[in-house]
Amino acid sequence: KVQQLLKDYFDGKEPNKGVNPDEAVAYGAAVQGGILSGEGGDETKDILLLDVAPLTLGIETVGGVMTKLIPRNTVIPTKKSQVFTTYQDQQTTVSIQVFEGERSLTKDCRLLGKFDLTGIAPAPRGTPQIEVTFEVDANGILNVKAEDKGTGKSEKITITNDKGRLSQEEIERMVREAEEFAEEDKKVKERIDARNSLETYVYNMKNQINDKDKLADKLESDEKEKIETATKEALEWLDDNQSAEKEDYEEKLKEVEAICNPIITAVYQRSGGAPGGGSSEEEEDGHDEL
């Protein structure tokens, strides 16, 4: 009845029925205080207040991509692990850069801390497995650990929630910006992914044709020469087209696959095995590169 009277008085305008955010915070703090002190009584005994991660947490991977491990609003405490790999042949060190934010690229997110994991056994690009674990405790303290699964070597960093962390207003601003630039960020991320897919395929083929456990001893000399020429030309094209569009990278990948995949298929048919390694299906199951 009162709401209808107000609506009539203000020329049909609907009254605001939402909750004042400042009041909501005050009520929540009061309830939490009552629960923690044990003085909440019957009013709070069935209430469960959950803390959440205010922003997405992740690390930087090739191309400046923000690879997300713990999404925004994940209930804490929480723990998440993901396996990554190396970007270059014989790479013995990876840099772990920890960010928070909602954008697709780390340049638009906030750096929380970084550390290096050294002593990785030299191997072809994409071979080492680096497991990165994010763990946020009930107090919001973030522990990040990186471990080389091959050598067992590891490094870690602890990021507390009292070292210049963002205010609620800054968090809301970052979320708004992510929504505002979502379409633009998506296009940039797709272009980087397309470039990485081409690069990964080419290096995968190069490694296979030189690895005796894979294709080195199974290829005819002319077959190997065709693949070497195709991969060499593709790498030169990548060097000359650093800022190509997504469609350009995808087209170049199709060109290289059209040369390499039939050769790989023929080799495995001759040897009675199944095609492997160079296919784009396997490529999609690969690990992000550091």
Curated annotation (Swiss-Prot):
Pfam families in the record: HSP70
Intracellular or extracellular location(s): Endoplasmic reticulum lumen
Disulfide bonds: none
Positions glycosylated per UniProt: 241
Bias (Acidic residues) ranges: 280-290
This protein's GO CC annotations: endoplasmic reticulum lumen
Annotated spans, Disordered: 268-290
SUPFAM superfamilies: Actin-like ATPase domain (SSF53067), Heat shock protein 70kD (HSP70), C-terminal subdomain (SSF100934), Heat shock protein 70kD (HSP70), peptide-binding domain (SSF100920)
Motif position, Prevents secretion from ER: 287-290
The keyword Endoplasmic reticulum appears for this protein: yes
UniProt keyword annotation of Ubl conjugation present: no
Annotated keywords: ATP-binding, Endoplasmic reticulum, Glycoprotein, Nucleotide-binding
GO molecular function: ATP binding; ATP-dependent protein folding chaperone
Location (main, coarse): endoplasmic reticulum
Family: Belongs to the heat shock protein 70 family.
Role this protein plays: Probably plays a role in facilitating the assembly of multimeric protein complexes inside the ER.
Record-given protein name: Luminal-binding protein 1
The species this protein was found in: Nicotiana tabacum (Common tobacco)
